[in-house]
Structure formats: C-alpha cells, structure tokens
Design a protein with these regions (language model features):
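Bacterial N-terminal signal peptides that target proteins for export
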Residues: 1-8
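Hydrophobic helical h-region of N-terminal Sec-dependent signal peptides
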Residues: 8-16
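Sec/Tat signal peptide C-region and signal peptidase I cleavage site
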Residues: 17-21
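Short, glycine-/small- and polar/acidic-enriched structural segments
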Residues: 22-163, 170, 177-183, 198-200, ...
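Soluble non-cytosolic domains of exported or imported proteins
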Residues: 61-64, 79, 133, 137-138, ...
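Pocket-lining segment of extracytoplasmic ligand-binding domains
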Residues: 166-264
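Secondary-structure end/capping motifs
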Residues: 221-313
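Conserved C-terminal helix/tail region of periplasmic/extracytoplasmic solute-binding proteins
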Residues: 296-344
Length: 344
C-alpha cells in the first residue's frame, strides 16, 4: 500500500483535535500482556484526548478470534501477535503498521518441573511426546522453531491446541508435560507450578515481533486517526522507558484486571527481555531502502512457517500488507512527532 505522504500529513494536526471534539476509534488487544500495557498507560494519562481520539476497547484471549472479529468491523486498529497478523493479512486484508515489541524471549516451550531437566539434557526425548499450545500463535511459532533447532519435526510430536488458560491448567494438573506459552503466562507457570523454560523463540534463533495492525478499509478512510493511534502508543513506550517504577505499578493493576498475578521480579523481566521501538526505531526496522526491511524479513519467515504447517497456501508479499506510511506521517508532522517522542 503506497500513499501520498505529503497530502496526508496535513490531516494530522493536534491543534485540530480539542478534548471536546474526540473521534471514536475502536482498539483491539489481548488483556494482561506486556505489549498491551501502553493502551492502559495512555488511557490513565489522558493522552488519547490530547490527539482528539476516544478509544473504545475490545479484548480477545488470542490472536485468531481477534483477527476474525475484524471482518465485522468490530475494531479499527490494535495490537496482536505476528502470526495472527500475517494470517489476518491473508484472510481479512489487515495491514501491519508497526511493531509492538520484540517478544522472541517471551514465547517459549515449557516443561513441568519433574520433566524439564530430562528434556534439557536430551531434547531428542521430546520425540513422541504431546505438546499443548495455542495453534497459529506466536507461541506455536516459537515451539516449532525450538523443535527445528533440535532436528525434530511437527510430525515427531503430538500437538494439542487449546487456549492459554487451558495450557496452564493441563500442565499444573500434570495432564501435560510440555506446553507452549507466552509471557506473562510463562512466569505464572514458573512461579505457581515450578515449570521451566526449556527453549524460547530467542534460543531457537527466531525473531518473534508483535504487530500493530489496522483494517485496510479503515486505514484508507481515516489515515490521520491511524497515525494518531500510533503516536499515542509510541508516547506510552517512551514514557515507560524513563518511569520504570511507576510503569511496573501500573502493569500490576493492568495484569490484575486480566486475572494475572506475577512477582515484581517477573514484571521487571518483561521490561528487561522485550525490546521496544520508538519512532526512529520503527522507521529503521521498516525501511525498505535496501533489499527489503527487517520487518519484511521477520514477517516473511513467519509466513513461510505458516505455509509449511498448512495454515495458508502461499506466502504473501510483504509489501502488500506491511506499510510504514503511517509512521512516516508522524515523522513528517512536527507536532505529532514531538508528541510521540515525549517522555514526560
């Protein structure tokens, strides 16, 4: 998707959006996740109103039902995993408009405490085992990347798909020895059930980004709102990067609402192990000046994984659904750029 940036920049002005003239924007996400925290922070700080937006939130337990809901226009923009983002591009024409974070270390294969050491010493012993996970998710991608690292194929194990809550329940009750989880569910299993990470996406050399997405129809009709949405999200990360203690306190409240309770140490681990991108960082990883951008490469690798698993027939061209147009709109608008980069 290619847009005339200069023509659109004029549409993105903070001055034209006083607090009393807010435009509704439907935002979707998955609750109690690190990359969704900026939505909560921005709401608590009142930053949406500063750009003339009024968010209406909808939440989903995982990416597949989330992207399916876009077909009925129940949401306009949001955050999701990279695997559902690619699937959403193929099935529902969703655009990837930025990244939420690098969650390569936050998606992993875990084993129960009684079995973990054995699997770590001899990964080949996983052959023939059952792994419970959420299919077509970043957790699924991480698990299968780990299997490939050990020379194992999907056909070498039995995969049972279920929601993350069911994965936690199955492993906690010793009805499953191996499970694919994403943070903070990883920390819940470690702290409450003594499970251990035996391999993360990062360990397997897989880059697992989170994606900021938009319905293509909405993005075409309301490009200025998409840019403002991104600016609010970026400002929240910028603020959190310089206010760790307050951010952790807000994370605790946000996670509590989503039914997740983890230690302060694990909450800090979320910040320490999951890099995020400011405006300059987003533009850098989305820059196609060379032979394709980093984001193109990462998402195409994920698409190739999905094709190999039979989830979709072909790998979609990255340029068809990944666009930095809206990040560029922010960069071209002095007021919106200053807003996105504000750390206080």
């Amino acid at each position: 998707m290619k847009m005339k940036i200069q023509a659109l920049v004029a549409l993105v002005t903070l001055a034209a959006a006083p607090a009393f003239a807010q435009t509704e924007i439907k935002v979707s996400y998955q609750p109690a996740l690190y990359w969704a925290l900026p939505f909560y922070v921005a709401t608590e700080k009142g930053w949406w109103a500063e750009v003339g937006l009024k968010p209406v939130f909808s939440t989903f337990p995982a990416g597949v039902p989330q992207i399916a809901a876009s077909a009925s226009k129940s949401w306009d923009v949001g955050g999701t995993g990279s695997v559902p983002a690619v699937l959403g591009a193929v099935r529902y024409n969703l655009l990837t408009i930025g990244l939420t974070n690098d969650e390569s270390a936050g998606n992993a294969l875990l084993a129960t405490g009684a079995k973990a050491d054995g699997f770590l010493k001899n990964p080949q012993s996983i052959k023939g085992q059952t792994i419970v996970l959420t299919a077509n998710s970043t957790g699924d991608y991480a698990v299968q990347s780990c299997l490939a690292k050990w020379g194992l194929k999907k056909s070498d194990v039995t995969i049972k798909s279920m929601g993350q809550a069911e994965v936690i329940s199955a492993m906690s009750s010793n009805n499953a020895d191996l499970g694919g989880l994403w943070a903070p569910n990883i920390y819940t299993m470690e702290e409450k059930a003594g499970a251990k990470v035996i391999c993360s996406g990062k360990d397997a050399g897989a880059i697992v980004p989170g994606a900021l997405v938009a319905r293509s129809e909405y993005a075409k009709e309301q490009p200025q709102n998409v840019a403002k949405f991104l600016a609010v999200y970026l400002r929240a990360w910028k603020w959190m990067s310089t206010h760790r203690a307050e951010s952790v306190a807000m994370m605790k409240k946000f996670y509590d609402v989503g039914g997740v309770s983890i230690s302060d140490a694990s909450m800090n681990k979320e910040f320490d192990t999951r890099p995020v991108y400011d405006l300059a960082g987003q533009l850098k990883v989305m820059n196609r000046a060379a032979a394709g951008s980093d984001v193109d490469k990462w998402m195409t690798q994920i698409a190739e994984f999905m094709k190999a698993t039979g989830t979709m027939p072909e790998v979609p061209p990255a340029a068809k659904y990944i666009t930095d147009d809206f990040m560029k709109m922010i960069d071209k608008d002095p007021k919106l750029k200053a807003f996105a980069n504000q750390a206080n």
